[in-house]
């Protein structure tokens, strides 16, 4: 039977999805299933790994059924996943010894403070590219080893395995035969030396984590093993794997130095491919691993905006200014400018490049003429201003002047936001035809690994641009608007602006 399709398993923070693509990179079928969020204490977040597997495997079966596709028609299966989330399981039984500790979970903050006191902060920054934070996997692993009865003894006896969600899914798909991860996911553990591309013995010793529990790191574009869907049909290669943001970067074909994408979700994730050079940031950005044109290791700078789409939710849920997120464009266009109104959405502090956890939100520049439309417009503009903050930081760190910004995520449907993003950054913004770029990245990697597609050059014809937004304001207007933003930010932080 001719193999006409590749499948992407897209395992996210709140739901598991399966997306089937044909040879022209069209979406043939999608299946999605939500799973439980577990909050045992304030600041703690967990998932049930078995529920994640059940939700993911059921969407795989459902997507095939919806498309009327037989498993023998599938060339390969790729994986993209929520990053950092940590699972430890028994090697013999395959059963988790504790719930998955989710990337959002802050329980291991005291462990981070201990590492900071012991002087590891600079070492972690220089060798892993990350900041010392509970966000990453390392201190989550240590917490499980310290707090689950018998865990440390089992780990030291070689009876436990660790994985981020990609590793867990491959283990389950291959019925316990394969224990692997890829460099993009490994680079988010705070245990992986991104320069030597190996697990870091200094950090393993500092955190008292046995190396025997760690997965083998294989390329992002490779065949890891084989699976049968629901135990039926022929064996399908499990091939191609990347963490969600790196997968979106590859799905947008940002495979060369200086190419960047911004994902507009609850927050915003901006990644710039820096090629073979691991750029150390002086502006609070993360240095991480990306995927190059042949599936090889490239590096990237990563910055995140805490409040993107969440700012629009605030307008709707707390202020009642809109009924639906889609309404924002209509109201923003009812006024010709922001009338001097700026919203700084520092509801949970500000991330890069400010890193001010104590900052809080503010509406700045209100006059008697300010109205609902100006506030809604200011909320949309704030998303673009924060993205410019990140882009400017990336330009300073990398020395690369961006020419184009590829975009994805729910908010890219907002034409006003996309045009303002182009205007305020003086960069062309490209919106893709297929917005499922995270899943598409995993599909591309899986297809390339088995020869379903021959090269990334071939893929450039598959991943088209739906619309380009070109900068349409003068330089002096752009800089006046941005100066207003910087002054607004200065009112909620300790920064001063001339």
From Swiss-Prot:
Recorded superkingdom: Bacteria
Instruction: Keywords in alphabetical order, please.
Output: ATP-binding, Glycerol metabolism, Kinase, Nucleotide-binding, Transferase
Q: Give the species.
A: Shewanella loihica (strain ATCC BAA-1088 / PV-4)
Q: Where does ATP bind?
A: 13-15, 266, 309, 313, 410
Report which reactions are catalysed by this protein.
glycerol + ATP = sn-glycerol 3-phosphate + ADP + H(+)
Q: Name one GO cellular component term.
A: cytosol
Give the matching Gene3D superfamilies: 3.30.420.40
What the entry lists under SUPFAM superfamilies is as follows: Actin-like ATPase domain (SSF53067)
What name appears for this protein in its UniProt entry?
A: Glycerol kinase
Q: Name one GO molecular function term.
A: ATP binding
Q: What is the lineage of its organism?
A: Bacteria, Pseudomonadati, Pseudomonadota, Gammaproteobacteria, Alteromonadales
**What residues bind ADP, as annotated?**
13, 17, 266, 309, 410, 414
Q: Which family does it belong to?
A: Belongs to the FGGY kinase family.
Q: Which GO terms describe its biological process?
A: glycerol catabolic process; glycerol metabolic process; glycerol-3-phosphate metabolic process
Functional description taken from the UniProt entry: Key enzyme in the regulation of glycerol uptake and metabolism. Catalyzes the phosphorylation of glycerol to yield sn-glycerol 3-phosphate.
EC number of this enzyme: 2.7.1.30
The annotated pathway is: Polyol metabolism; glycerol degradation via glycerol kinase pathway; sn-glycerol 3-phosphate from glycerol: step 1/1
């Amino acid at each position: 039977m001719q193999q006409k399709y590749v499948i992407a398993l897209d395992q996210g923070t709140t739901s598991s999805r399966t997306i089937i693509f044909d040879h022209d990179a069209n979406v043939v079928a999608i299946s999605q299933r939500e799973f439980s969020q577990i909050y045992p204490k304030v600041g703690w977040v967990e998932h049930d790994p078995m529920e994640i597997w059940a939700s993911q495997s059921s969407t795989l079966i459902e997507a095939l059924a919806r498309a009327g596709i037989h498993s023998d028609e599938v060339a390969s299966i790729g994986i993209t996943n929520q990053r950092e989330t940590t699972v430890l399981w028994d090697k013999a039984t395959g059963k988790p010894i504790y719930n998955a500790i989710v990337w959002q979970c802050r329980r291991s903050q005291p462990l981070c403070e201990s590492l900071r006191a012991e002087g590891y902060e600079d070492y972690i920054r220089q060798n892993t590219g990350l900041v010392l934070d509970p966000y990453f996997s390392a201190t989550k692993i240590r917490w499980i080893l310290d707090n689950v009865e018998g865990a440390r003894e089992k780990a030291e006896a070689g009876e436990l395995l660790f994985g981020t969600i990609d590793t867990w899914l491959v283990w389950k798909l291959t019925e316990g035969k394969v224990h692997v991860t890829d460099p993009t996911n490994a680079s988010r553990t705070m245990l992986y030396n991104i320069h030597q591309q190996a697990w870091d013995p200094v950090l393993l010793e500092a955190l008292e984590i046995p190396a025997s529990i760690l997965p083998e790191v294989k390329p992002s574009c490779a065949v890891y093993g084989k699976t049968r869907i629901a135990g039926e049909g022929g064996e399908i290669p499990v091939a191609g794997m990347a963490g969600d943001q790196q997968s979106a970067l590859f799905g947008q074909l940002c495979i060369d130095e200086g190419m960047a994408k911004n994902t507009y979700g609850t927050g915003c994730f901006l990644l710039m491919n820096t090629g073979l050079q691991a750029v150390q940031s002086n502006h609070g950005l993360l240095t991480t691993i990306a995927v190059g044109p042949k599936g090889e290791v490239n590096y990237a700078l990563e910055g995140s905006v805490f409040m993107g789409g969440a700012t629009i939710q605030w307008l709707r849920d707390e202020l009642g200014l809109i009924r639906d997120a889609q309404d924002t464009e209509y109201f923003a266009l009812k006024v010709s400018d922001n009338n001097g109104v700026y919203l700084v959405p520092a509801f949970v502090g500000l991330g890069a490049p400010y890193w001010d956890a104590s900052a809080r939100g503010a509406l700045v520049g209100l006059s008697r003429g300010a109205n609902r439309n100006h506030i809604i417009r200011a909320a949309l503009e704030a998303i673009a201003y924060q993205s410019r903050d990140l882009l400017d930081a990336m330009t300073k760190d990398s020395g690369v002047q961006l020419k184009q910004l590829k975009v994805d995520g729910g908010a890219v449907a907002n034409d006003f936001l996309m045009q303002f993003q182009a205007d305020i950054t003086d960069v062309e913004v490209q919106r893709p035809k297929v917005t499922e770029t995270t899943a598409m990245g995993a599909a591309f990697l899986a297809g390339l690994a088995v020869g379903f597609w021959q090269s990334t050059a071939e893929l450039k014809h598959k991943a088209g641009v739906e619309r380009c937004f070109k900068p349409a304001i003068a330089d002096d207007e752009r800089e006046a608007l941005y100066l207003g933003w910087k002054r607004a930010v200065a009112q909620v932080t300790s920064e001063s602006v001339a």
